[in-house]
From Swiss-Prot:
Coiled coil: none
Induction pattern: By stress conditions e.g. heat shock.
Ranges of compositional bias, category Low complexity: 584-610
Organism: Beutenbergia cavernae (strain ATCC BAA-8 / DSM 12333 / CCUG 43141 / JCM 11478 / NBRC 16432 / NCIMB 13614 / HKI 0122)
CDD domains to which the protein is assigned, alphabetical: ASKHA_NBD_HSP70_DnaK-like (cd10234)
Matching InterPro entries: ATPase_NBD, Chaperone_DnaK, Heat_shock_70_CS, HSP70_C_sf, HSP70_peptide-bd_sf, Hsp_70_fam
Region Disordered: start-end pairs: 583-628
Function: Acts as a chaperone.
Acidic residues bias (residue ranges): 611-628
UniProtKB keywords: ATP-binding, Chaperone, Nucleotide-binding, Phosphoprotein, Stress response
Pfam families referenced in this protein's UniProt entry, alphabetically: HSP70
PROSITE patterns: HSP70_1, HSP70_2, HSP70_3
Name of this protein: Chaperone protein DnaK
Positions of modified residues (Phosphothreonine): T175
Length: 628
């Protein structure tokens, strides 16, 4: 059976892990890091960069670098590069493709199956978009798992036999979740992890803390230099990077200095930024962001119907929880309970995803995971009211049916509008889509019986159907108002992703050919210069002409022309060796043995490009004097 990986697809960074011998291992990427920046860039030469290399060039390529795309999942957001538009799913697929490739390099085998995590508070459209991104990247998405649930799975399996309540406080780069889970083991060491309640804010994360520092720095420059940097894209990118660094430094230090030279230009010359930021200042400017974490926490405690004293463990997830102010607010909210420091907040979600992948694949048979739907699900009924069929925090998978009727006499069809959320009126909630049940037999209003069934699978993805009990006609939901991609669109994007991989391979091969050709030009020119006095003019002229032709080919884009001119130069260069050997023999005959041997031997290799060692024949040189 093929190996399945667990992927934490984050706003700022992503992580991939796998089970080895039943135990989870975080896989380092090609750059040697265990976390991969969720950054995608399109270079001006057309190359697609992903991860650390994309992040490093962001300042010089602002308009073609995409970050924090996770915040756009499940929306109609698109970005245009070189007259081609990309959806959030396509950009996320580039990140997933990079993680897939790194996992394949580590494991030495193809990887097709994956469990991908999402914030617990992701709605149906956001979950479906994540699944689509996995498909575009060439992955078979076994399961979509909530991030706090994955973290609790990684943490909870190491716990003892008693039932315990674990609170997971997950503050990532762009999203925030709080989940309460019950973890227990029986005598056979079989673990059951059940989510009791979950809540969150999909528009709150470390990016918002960074932005507050950026806004402060922009105002400082405006006050001191009279220049507004808010429209200067390159300056803003430098400020964003400096803000992220400052935020991290303030997690361990009480103050930091932000210094950026030549940030922009003013009437008085270049602008140099040099600002000191204390932890107290930082906490003051982000106080309202911290306040926003409290409501979801209180909602979870209320929904679960427990007291604070019932919480056994508090687990912090996401890099943003390293901020001291976040740790302090968690302690305050939980009545002074010290958060657990035994897990890596950046990696624990991917570890849990790998464990769940192992459970699905049958590698781990000692755990059962029971998740919940984070938001209530319902349809719009007369008066615009939201009639809920499935309440939030219902264990999934689940299926519920409800019978509705017509609002008018002889109504031939009903339009069923599906919503997700907690508000009393449908228009205030998230519209998932609409579908129509037609062919209803003529009857007075209130008489037809329309059975609407909601089915939420283990991924938290919604399926809806409606059936007229009178005629037996049935209609399943095809989302028309949501952001789910149609199958043909996904297929097209998959093909484009495969073509992109082939293009990368071709581009890499071309780069290798060019490097070899440039090396040949350099070594040949060096040889011509060093042996100018010993080479006949006709040989030197022929080789110089071949060098010039290869240089011209290298200036163009035709790689076949480069290969042809490279072969021509390699052939012409062999004449240098022949000429130098002839010169050496003449000098030996004139009584000066060995004087030109080094030059001749150097020339012998001049026409052989790097990597062509297969054509070299090893031979033993026999000293004629010894034989005598």
């Amino acid at each position: 059976m093929a190996r399945a990986v667990g992927i934490d697809l984050g706003t700022t960074n992503s992580v991939v892990a796998v089970l080895e011998g039943g135990e989870p291992t975080v896989i380092a990427n090609a750059e040697g890091s265990r976390t991969t920046p969720s950054v995608v860039a399109f270079s001006k030469s057309g190359e697609v960069l992903v991860g650390e290399v994309a992040k490093r060039q962001a300042v010089t390529n602002v308009d073609r670098t995409i970050t924090s795309v996770k915040r756009h999942m499940g929306t109609d957001w698109k970005v245009s590069v070189d007259d081609k538009s990309y959806t959030a799913q396509e950009i996320s697929a580039r990140v997933l493709g990079k993680l897939k490739k790194d996992a394949e390099s580590y494991l030495g085998e193809p990887v097709t199956d994956a469990v991908i995590t999402v914030p617990a508070y992701f709605n149906d459209a956001e979950r479906q978009a994540t699944k689509d991104a996995g498909q575009i990247a060439g992955l078979n998405v076994l399961r979509i798992v909530n991030e706090p649930t994955a973290a609790a799975l990684a943490y909870g399996l190491e716990r003892g036999k008693e039932d315990e309540l674990i609170l997971v406080f997950d503050l990532g780069g762009g999203t925030f979740d709080v989940s309460l889970l019950e973890v227990g083991k029986d005598e056979d060491d079989f673990s059951t992890i059940q989510v009791r309640a979950t809540n969150g804010d999909n528009r709150l994360g470390g990016d918002d803390w960074d932005q507050r520092i950026v806004d402060w720095l922009v105002s400082q420059v405006k006050n001191k230099d009279g220049v507004d940097l808010s429209k200067d894209k390159i300056a803003l990118q430098r400020l964003r990077e400096a803000a992220e660094t400052a935020k991290k430094e303030l997690s361990s230090a009480t103050s930091t200095t932000i210094s950026l030279q030549y940030l922009s230009m003013s009437e008085n010359g270049p602008i140099h930024l040099d600002e000191k930021l204390t932890r107290a200042q930082f906490q003051q400017m982000t106080e309202d962001l911290l306040e926003r974490t409290k409501t979801p926490f209180h909602n979870v405690i209320k929904d679960a119907g427990i007291s604070l004293s019932a919480i056994d463990h508090v687990v912090l997830v996401g890099g943003s929880t390293r901020m001291p102010a976040v740790t302090d607010v968690v302690k305050e909210l939980t009545g002074g309970k010290e958060p657990n420091k035994g897990v890596n907040p950046d990696e624990v979600v991917a570890v849990g995803a790998a464990l769940q992948a192992g459970v699905i694949q049958g590698e781990r048979k000692d755990v059962l995971l029971i998740d919940v739907t984070p938001l209530s699900l319902g349809i719009e009924t007369k008066g615009g009211v939201m009639t809920k069929l499935i309440e939030r925090n219902t264990a999934i998978p689940t299926k519920r049916s409800e019978v509705f009727s017509t609002a008018e006499d002889n109504q031939p069809s009903v339009l069923i509008q599906v919503f997700q959320g907690e508000r009393d009126f449908a228009s205030d909630n998230k519209a998932l889509g609409t579908f129509e049940l037609t062919g209803i037999a003529p009857a007075p209003r209130g008489m037809p019986q329309i059975e609407v069934t909601f089915d939420i699978d283990a991924n938290g993805i919604v399926h809806v159907s409606a059936k007229d009990r009178g005629t037996g006609k049935e209609q399943s939901m095809t989302i028309t108002g949501g952001s789910a991609l149609p199958k043909d669109e996904i297929d097209r994007m998959i093909k484009e992703a495969e073509a992109h991989a082939a293009e990368d391979h071709k581009r890499r091969e071309e780069a290798e050919v060019r490097n070899t050709a440039e090396q040949l030009v350099y070594s040949t020119e060096k040889l011509l210069t060093e042996n100018a006095e010993k080479l006949p003019e006709d040989v030197a002229s022929e080789v110089r002409a071949a060098v010039a032709e290869l240089k011209t080919a290298l200036e163009g884009t035709d790689i076949d022309a480069v290969k042809a001119k490279q072969e021509a130069l390699a052939t012409a260069s062999q004449k240098i060796g022949q000429a130098l050997y002839a010169s050496a023999e003449q000098e030996q005959a004139a009584g000066n043995p060995g004087a030109a041997e080094a030059d001749a031997e150097a020339a012998a290799g001049a026409g052989t490009p790097e990597g062509a060692d297969d054509d070299v024949i090893d031979a033993e040189i026999v000293d004629e004097d010894e034989k005598k």
